[in-house]
Amino acid sequence: MAPRSAGKASYVVIALGSNVHIFARPHRRGELAQCFGTVLGSPARAVEFPGIDQPMLVVSFPGGGHLSIEFTDEAPDDEQPRLGAWLELRADDPAAVLQAALEAGLTEVKHPGHPYYFMIPGGQVFTIAPTS
């Protein structure tokens, strides 16, 4: 809530942006590029950024939004679902996207929220929600 002015309440509208930045270990680069490009149909491109040692991968999703992946040896890395922020993808057919992920060898994650969760290499979890 923003400061009040002249006795009236003033509110600031805040929204979550459509860009996400995560970290991964360098040995995951190829797996992650494959995961997004082949499995999810959202090719990743390498992008150089001043001050960052290795090129990042930037994924542009067809329905909007971007995911940038910065590579560092200090990134968390696990074969189990990471207990951190889980990211949401939206699709017309969440079940079909999950099936494609599973057929590509990605790991399904069970959670009572709904049935469409999977883990990418390194432990980051995504949920797939319907677009409507």
Report the location of each language-model feature:
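N-terminal beta-strand motif that seeds the catalytic metal site of vicinal oxygen chelate
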Residues: 1-34, 39, 45, 84-87
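A generic structural signal for short, solvent-exposed coil/turn residues
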Residues: 12-14, 36, 50-51, 61-63, ...
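Vicinal oxygen chelate
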Residues: 17-27, 57-61, 75-102, 114-121
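Short acidic/polar active-site loop segments enriched in Thr and Asp
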Residues: 18, 107, 124
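Short secondary-structure junctions
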Residues: 40-49, 103-111
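Conserved short beta-strand elements that form part of the metal-binding/catalytic scaffold
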Residues: 42-81, 125-131
